[in-house]
From Swiss-Prot:
GO terms for cellular component: extracellular exosome; multivesicular body lumen. CDD domains: pepsin_A. This is Pepsin A-5. It comes from the Eukaryota. Residues 16-62 form a propeptide. InterPro entries: Aspartic_peptidase_A1, Aspartic_peptidase_AS, Aspartic_peptidase_N, Pepsin_A, PEPTIDASE_A1, Peptidase_aspartic_dom_sf. Its EC number is 3.4.23.1.
Amino acid sequence: MKWLLLLGLVALSECIMYKVPLIRKKSLRRTLSERGLLKDFLKKHNLNPARKYFPQWEAPTLVDEQPLENYLDMEYFGTIGIGTPAQDFTVVFDTGSSNLWVPSVYCSSLACTNHNRFNPEDSSTYQSTSETVSITYGTGSMTGILGYDTVQVGGISDTNQIFGLSETEPGSFLYYAPFDGILGLAYPSISSSGATPVFDNIWNQGLVSQDLFSVYLSADDKSGSVVIFGGIDSSYYTGSLNWVPVTVEGYWQITVDSITMNGETIACAEGCQAIVDTGTSLLTGPTSPIANIQSDIGASENSDGDMVVSCSAISSLPDIVFTINGVQYPVPPSAYILQSEGSCISGFQGMNVPTESGELWILGDVFIRQYFTVFDRANNQVGLAPVA
């Protein structure tokens, strides 16, 4: 009987998962549009989502060319605490980057004044460093310092975690951003300044039983989405998980066999690379095939630069199918057409990223809302299954 009890306790310990609920909020793009500021923003900022991927690292100056404008369309956010006692921050859980940073009290930029700011003097566990960090984007850069403190993430106390404290955040548009900072969940190889990413630090301290995390993004307007650290909850998906090898341990990069519509190949005819990225809201790919897709679904550009379709046409549009590791993953029009306040916007965006392996696609939230996703660091693979 004692052995049975012990085995039961061991099994229970292996099933412990830490869940961080994600709240779906109005995107920065939508807020700017409602305030009549979007056109001016788009004029001043040359939006190029490609800058987020494969940046040119400059180690001596610790420069990371990761444009914050990439988060213009983000809608899913979670809360973390930093310090003792914890100071709360709303962050993007981003599998397309690796650093953690939040605004600090040292930041007097307009963008910082409307957000929570970390105060090191209010934390008994904060440790300062002499290191600085700069994230370059658009017309300026976010500059700051690096420090160490305890980070509370979904019930996990991640001690001695390095993170960035911003001192300047250019661009008044960030004043309206629905998030305070970014929590990166990609591999440490792309971390600016060599900072240990949050999940790596959590795993290294033995705080989770499995070296993986998983993501469920609900289509619900406000709640239901979650990041699960250290486990997989099968109630979020149907069928079984299909596993796809990571091809490059930097981003969560995988191979796509082909992309088809109505049974015909429309892109990626000889295979291509794709990054599974919770920090990108849309499905992005090379401008030429994306332009063809936009044409095929009847999308045209409006005055805000969005590609829109007739809402009445959605029911007649075809699925777009991504074949990955031999398994088909259809994305229906109800997923790739985003409906907002009477407008129906295409969830596809053109982006050219030169890579040694050819064209690159980004499977953002439009895709992840359809497929429960497991990011398995232990086996360097991504698991996908239809959401429940």
